[in-house]
Amino acid sequence: MLNKLDDYPIHQTPEPIAHPATSDRNVYDRTWFNGYANDGSYYFGIGMAIYPHRDILDCAFSVVEQGGRQHCFYGSRRAPLERTDMSVGPFRIEIIEPMKRVRVVLEDNKSGVSCDLTFSARTASIQEGRQTLWSGARRVMDATRFDQFGRWNGVVRHPDGEMKVSDDMCFGTKDRSWGVRRVGEPETGGAPVMPGGIFFLWAPLVWDDHISHAIFFDGPKGEALVREGIVAPLYKSEADVPGVEDGRDQRMATTRHRVTYVPGTRLASSAEIDLVDHDGQTRTIELEPVLKFQMKGLGYTHPEWGQGMWKGELETGGESFDPRQVDPLQPENIHVQQVVRAHDGARRGIGVLEQICIGPYAPSGFADYFDGAK
């Protein structure tokens, strides 16, 4: 099973590139983006992933404007052997220059959602620490992720109108990850799976001359499973980005978070993040949400278009809904990203706070799987 990439000296195992190093059914390789206006007036998300042992390639595009509906396109197909084929029906991703420039195209389709967008990097790529989570003796997540901050140009069309996207006001994050994590239909057979939960925060923020980033995975008592904070230079143009990686990145000694929730929900009304450097100096960043995006619009916990679920040789679909009217405690609605204003007392920024909290979480007073804040 050879493909074009086998002509390059990039192999990490004796197998061809199409053969993952693990036989775990949940192996995946994902490309993901967000984009948002610097005034919080809109947000869009993009995702595509291949699941080699499920033989599936799926994708999604979703957009919401302030005060409007969230519009979604979903696509799924049998995975191509050729890994450079990053297309699902009317949707495709074109890597124009690796680690610098990417084009995302969604041609006209029955969902009424389409786009032609180009992402241009403003930072080098930033590798997060390896993320490994366990359920009993089983490793249920083992992934590498890197992020890159940039700007967007292009156009988005949806059933309620058209958005011109320009790099003078549209920021965004590219997120590449690969490894193993739970996807697709629930597994059957064997002993019943012990109940588990998840607490996750992800906060990429853009400031005048730098970015900050914080990642958290917590256990049910608030114990730290993953903690990472990063500060890195932000460049004026793509041409200024020094290379694949930037030696000026600063890794924090640790990070802390405090989230205040809207009563009766698990949706943040405000949050604070502490970045603690190796000299013990703490930078506290306050976050104010201004726009909500439901991550089910990209397939996360979606009951019909969940990631890694077999839909057929090639299927596409779409939907529109008002994110202000969904039940915030339904399992499919708990995972969100919010566009947030950020300030640290001296500087102001803009960015995103991603959040998912399912199951008991003592620091916030959650005692059940889907109870809301008091």
Annotate the PLM regions.
Residues 1-374:
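Structured soluble/peripheral alpha/beta segments that form catalytic or ligand/cofactor-binding pockets
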